[in-house]
Amino acid sequence: AIIRDAGFTIQNIHVRIVPKSNGQEIAYKVTNQKAKTYGGIPVFGLYPDYVNTVEVSYTKVAGDKREEIKESYRIYAPPVYFYATGARDQKNMDMNPEVKKVDPEFKDRLYFINNQILNSWKTGQFTWNNPQGGALEWGGGAQNAIIDTTGEVRWFMNTDPIHDQYSVLESGPMLGFEQNKDGAYTWGFGQRYLKYDIMGRKIWNRRLPQSYIDFSHALCAAENGNYFLRVAAAAYACLLYTSPSPRD
């Protein structure tokens, strides 16, 4: 969610998501640059299918006037949404992890979960009668979410806008998530590699160079700003013919 700035300059921003009873608090500061990027206050960590209470404080600047503001918002966040495959073991959309024990040292942690749903009629459009496949052989839908140490989902990725099960170039298993130094995430799937921030803002979404196919598992950021991708060669020269190579 974004709490819009209404055209005012706002600084010294602090956000707190009021936790559920016995829940985990999420609180953070927002830089002036991020406030400009989003046109307001980015709100992260809302409980899904729940009316959240969000407390914000900031300095409102209008000319020479500076005003310290504290506000509280009630924001409903929609339910978690992942692909429904028809599999017998899929009974709901939530991840429902069972928390066994939380060490006090780790109780404020958040965990990014990257899970794959098995292929189904919807998520396996390019694997009919072909036992070899490539990255698309494992083309089930993705379950990407961030959970807290109480087992609650605090963020999830709706993949529909970027993942098209009916397109060879826009489907495949989402793998290789890595948080970069700027906070944004890089990952890849099928014939693509991407970078988005946690609020869903696209930084880039690119097709693999045409000499390569079938991204899987690893997209690593280098110190110099380049990226290493695990892919296959689109055409490897053999004695009498060319053939796609295995990944690596």
Where in this protein do the model-derived segments appear?
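Short beta-strand segments enriched for Tyr within beta-sheet-rich domains
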Residues: 46, 50-58
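Structural signature of eukaryotic scaffold interfaces centered on beta-propeller domains
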Residues: 92-105, 173-181, 220-223
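Beta-propeller domains
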Residues: 119-164, 193-197
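Conserved small/polar residues in nucleotide/adenosyl-binding loops
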Residues: 241-248
